[in-house]
Regions:
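Activation-segment/catalytic-loop signature of the eukaryotic protein kinase fold
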Residues: 71
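Activation segment signature within eukaryotic-like protein kinase domains
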Residues: 109-110
């Protein structure tokens, strides 16, 4: 089976409205990943929306963002598709299903994702669906953020009450049906970081309503209370990311990366003493005093 000039080889994954396949591009002589969407997206207003959002993704260029090579609609089957960089590795979702990861590793991975988000935010793009399934860890331990399919140009975003994405990673403003911005991605990445550090979800519930209620009103245990190897200052960073009020949340993904990278450079035994620089401590303290 072919899609355009691309030769389909195997299915890599399947979602609710799409599937990802491994393919070969004979023109460039390289492997690629192709995301195939439902034909419904190729009709009417949805077609224009698909093409518009694909162009949004195509604007992004960052080492930790999966590169978009091509896009189109296979007219014979009316199948929209995105041709992307083929990443050899596994989703973070599969890794944390086995439990927590060392906090220096968790901080490194989260910091790289935060830098990728910062690059997107500087281009007026929010991801809108940051979760472990959309974070790939390569075979050489690099991080790749994928699936900007839910992203929006912030310059065009108004109040939208529709709930897309995965409930466990929703931010409070999304549940309330309010406009989202870059701080919404920070909250979702904070949830991912919490899961990496502790091996559990901060807002777990036995129903959609319970999850939403927990996101809106409960305060999860501090990570160090779940995993004693985690230093207290890292607790503070996670708390700042998960602040329910966007005005008091960790202000930018760039700031989040700056706060996390020092932990990533230290071994666990040294990390609690690593973040003692006055300017670093004062930045976190200011965030927490306002939370």
């Amino acid at each position: 089976m072919n899609v355009g000039r691309y030769q389909i080889q195997e299915t890599l994954g399947t979602g609710a409205n799409s599937r990802v396949v491994r393919a070969y591009d004979p023109m460039i002589d390289r492997g690629v990943a192709i995301k195939l969407f439902s034909p419904e997206i190729a009709r009417g207003e949805a077609r224009a929306k698909f093409l518009r959002e694909a162009r949004v993704v195509g604007k992004l260029s960052h080492p930790a963002i999966v590169t978009l090579h091509d896009m189109g609609i296979e007219e014979s089957t009316m199948t929209p598709y995105l041709v992307m960089e083929l990443v050899e590795g596994q989703p973070l979702e599969r890794i944390i299903a086995k439990g927590s990861v060392p906090f220096s590793t968790a901080c490194a991975w989260a910091a790289h994702v935060a830098n990728a988000l910062a690059a997107a935010h500087h281009n007026a793009v929010i991801h809108g669906d940051v979760k472990p399934a959309n974070i790939l860890i390569t075979t050489d331990n690099r991080v790749k953020l994928t699936d900007f399919g839910m992203s929006r140009l912030t310059s065009h975003q108004g109040v939208d009450s529709s709930l897309f994405g995965t409930p466990a990673y929703w931010c409070p403003e999304q549940i309330h049906g309010r406009a989202q911005d870059a701080r919404s991605d920070v909250f979702s990445l904070g949830v991912v970081l919490y899961e990496m550090l502790t091996g559990i979800s901060p807002f777990a519930g036995d129903s959609l309503q319970a999850v939403c209620n927990n996101i809106l009103s409960s305060s999860p245990q501090r990570p160090s209370h779940v995993n004693s190897s985690i230093p207290a200052l890292l607790d503070d960073i996670v708390t700042a990311c998960l602040c329910k009020d966007p005005q008091r949340r960790m202000p930018t993904a760039e700031t989040m990366a700056e706060q996390l990278f020092p932990f990533a450079r230290r071994k666990p035994a040294l990390a609690s003493a690593a973040i003692v620089e006055p300017n670093q401590r004062s930045r976190v303290s200011r965030l927490l005093r306002s939370a």
